[in-house]
Regions:
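Amphipathic, hydrophobic secondary-structure cores in small proteins
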Residues: 33-35, 39-64
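Short hydrophobic/aromatic-rich motifs at helix boundaries and adjacent loops
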Residues: 1-3, 12-16, 45-48
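Intrinsically disordered, low-complexity, basic-enriched segments
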Residues: 18, 30, 45-46, 54-55, ...
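Long, compositionally biased
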Residues: 2-5, 60-87
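General helical secondary-structure elements
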Residues: 9, 13, 42-45, 65, ...
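N-terminal acidic leader/helix
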Residues: 7-40
Length: 87
C-alpha cells in the first residue's frame, strides 16, 4: 500500500500545471454540457466562438476551480448566455 502511494505521488508530481488547468477546462465543458443536456462538442464550439475559454475560464482558473461544481456550472452557463447575447 505504501509503495502504491509513493508511485501515485510521483506521477502527480510529474503532471504539469498546464495539464491540470486543461483538465479543469475539459471538466468545465463536460459539466456545462451535461447541465444543458447537449453535447460536449456543441458547448466547446459555443465557448470557443465567444472566447469564453481563453478570456474567462483560463484567466480565472484559481478562483473558479475552488467553486463547487454546481456554482461553477451555473456561472459558466450565465456567462455563456450573456456573452452570446452580446454578439
Amino acid at each position: 500500500l505504501r509503495a502504491n502511494h509513493q508511485i501515485i505521488l510521483e506521477v502527480l508530481r510529474k503532471i504539469s500545471k498546464d495539464q491540470i488547468v486543461m483538465a479543469f477546462v475539459a471538466t468545465c465543458i463536460e459539466a456545462t454540457a451535461r447541465q444543458l443536456n447537449t453535447s460536449y462538442n456543441e458547448v466547446f464550439q459555443r465557448m470557443e466562438r465567444i472566447g469564453l475559454i481563453d478570456n474567462y475560464i483560463l484567466p480565472n482558473y484559481e478562483p473558479l476551480h475552488s467553486e463547487s461544481r454546481e456554482v461553477l456550472v451555473q456561472r459558466l452557463i450565465e456567462c455563456l448566455i450573456n456573452w452570446e447575447n452580446r454578439l
